Amino acid sequence: MAKEATRVKRRERKNIASGVAHVNASFNNTMITITDAQGNTISWSSAGAMGFKGSRKSTPYAAQVAAEDAARKAAEHGMRTLEVEVSGPGSGRESALRALQAAGFLVTSIRDVTPIPHNGCRPRKRRRV
């Protein structure tokens, strides 16, 4: 019996004028997710998805390339203004933000939403080099 050809679901173009850019900058990677106001994902990218491997993922340049990619995908959906939520201690925080502004988005607000414990879990042991 012949297999029925599976149809590739074409990504429909959403017309969304404003959204939220979530920048998650960890020590190992930087992930950028652009959502609408309700939190539905419009586009995403990360340093690892851009082809950077190992310690190169944690560089500011990798974060910049990932932010440019996510911004380009979001612009295809008609997005023009962004609120930015930055989370995490990584080195790609500022460069990702700068790349989003350089991509032509109007950044209306920047929030740091890094979770800070009120003396919660015991931290991992200190690294001695």
Swiss-Prot record:
GO BP field: translation
Gene3D superfamilies, per database record: Ribosomal protein S11 (3.30.420.80)
Origin superkingdom: Bacteria
Pfam families: Ribosomal_S11 (PF00411)
Cellular component, GO, one term: ribosome
GO molecular function: rRNA binding; structural constituent of ribosome
InterPro entries: Ribosomal_uS11, Ribosomal_uS11_bac-type, Ribosomal_uS11_CS, Ribosomal_uS11_sf
UniProt entry keywords in alphabetical sequence: Ribonucleoprotein, Ribosomal protein, RNA-binding, rRNA-binding
Assembly mode: Part of the 30S ribosomal subunit. Interacts with proteins S7 and S18. Binds to IF-3.
Family in the record: Belongs to the universal ribosomal protein uS11 family.
NCBIfam families tied to this protein: PRK05309.1, uS11_bact
Entry function: Located on the platform of the 30S subunit, it bridges several disparate RNA helices of the 16S rRNA. Forms part of the Shine-Dalgarno cleft in the 70S ribosome.
Protein name per Swiss-Prot or TrEMBL: Small ribosomal subunit protein uS11
Organism of this sequence: Xanthobacter autotrophicus (strain ATCC BAA-1158 / Py2)
